[in-house]
UniProtKB/Swiss-Prot annotation:
Gene: sucC
Residues in ATP-grasp domain copies: 9-245
Cofactor remark: Binds 1 Mg(2+) ion per subunit.
Class of this enzyme: ligase
Keywords, ordered alphabetically: ATP-binding, Ligase, Magnesium, Metal-binding, Nucleotide-binding, Tricarboxylic acid cycle
Binding-site list for substrate: N265, G322, I323, V324
The protein's role, per its UniProt record: Succinyl-CoA synthetase functions in the citric acid cycle (TCA), coupling the hydrolysis of succinyl-CoA to the synthesis of either ATP or GTP and thus represents the only step of substrate-level phosphorylation in the TCA. The beta subunit provides nucleotide specificity of the enzyme and binds the substrate succinate, while the binding sites for coenzyme A and phosphate are found in the alpha subunit.
InterPro entries recorded: ATP-grasp, ATP-grasp_succ-CoA_synth-type, ATP_grasp_subdomain_1, Succ-CoA_synthase_bsu_CS, SUCC_ACL_C, Succ_CoA_ligase-like_bsu, Succinyl-CoA_synth-like
Family statement: Belongs to the succinate/malate CoA ligase beta subunit family.
GO biological process: one example: succinyl-CoA metabolic process
Protein name: Succinate--CoA ligase [ADP-forming] subunit beta
Keyword flag Metal-binding: yes
The protein's Enzyme Commission number: 6.2.1.5
PROSITE patterns: ATP_GRASP (PS50975), SUCCINYL_COA_LIG_3 (PS01217)
Amino acid sequence: MNLHEYQAKALLKEYGMPVQEGILATNADEAVAAFEQLGGKFAVMKAQVHAGGRGKAGGVKVAKSKEDVIEFANNIIGTRLVTYQTDANGQPVNSIIVAEDVYPVERELYLGAVVDRSSRRITFMASTEGGVEIEKVAEETPEKIIKVEVDPLVGLQPFQAREVAFALGLKDKQIGQFVKIMTAAYQAFVENDFALFEINPLSVRENGEILCVDAKVGIDSNALYRLPKVAALRDKSQENERELKASEFDLNYVALEGNIGCMVNGAGLAMATMDIIKLYGGQPANFLDVGGGATKERVIEAFKIILADTSVQGVLINIFGGIVRCDMIAEAIIAAVQEVNVTVPVVVRLEGNNAELGAKLLDESGLKLISANGLSDAAEKVVAAVKA
């Protein structure tokens, strides 16, 4: 679950981190009032969406007058912002931040942290190249990225934060400020189950103060049950409708940009299914794992979610029966096809527990389903059906 910039800043401020002050506005009148509250001379206005690249997409603008504020607010609130991190439909802009003037600045730095699954530790990253996409820095000048792994048994140590401060070229009182910021960031990360944390830019002002000008926070969705305060910040309007619907039925669904819908039980098999579809020249439209304990109802909902994607031109159902019986899956497929107006080819591959019984049920259903013998055969058939 992602947070908006204003939500992330408010959360980090609770941990004592110095953040750029901003006022949320949902219409032009509120934006003008916020602009005047901040002095009425200069402000930065930022569209609030769950995506990076807002500046290049027209989602960030400097305002030097009330007219600038009114124009920006009227033009962007209620629209959808398309950036390099969104799909072609973009994300809805329901509000903007009118933020205080923090310029000029002496330097712009980067500070971020993720859970590194290879080392099984929280890893901090810092760079002198703030204000630009960290992915671009990693690709073009990886030597400019400083990494620090945190031992979960002892947590972030002050000496680690100081080493990063020295590597960033900070001096005198700036070192102490940075240590406090990095320590607070680690505390917020652990206590709120962050999956991702970024301050970009972390600005060094001309007066020597360090300030968090932007903030990006992603929360581990699996931890929301123990984070009621954070869970209340969820903005469902920013989430993919199909992914949101899938979460209600405990389905693991991720929308992709292909045209072949996939329904599989097991994450590993689902990834293998997507790989083999691509091997045969197709493009998967989604990742969908119905899970090892899939019920008939969940399979029906999974089918509906797949077909709700208008780009889907074919469906591959790949089930390996273990805990899940193939005959139960077959019954669910039949029920779903009968309930939903299916106009695309559906290829079904069943293996394992009661696979023969499941195949028999499908054959006797009278529905236009394409049976497959093996994964390669299934992938070849669905790609051919879509291209036909």
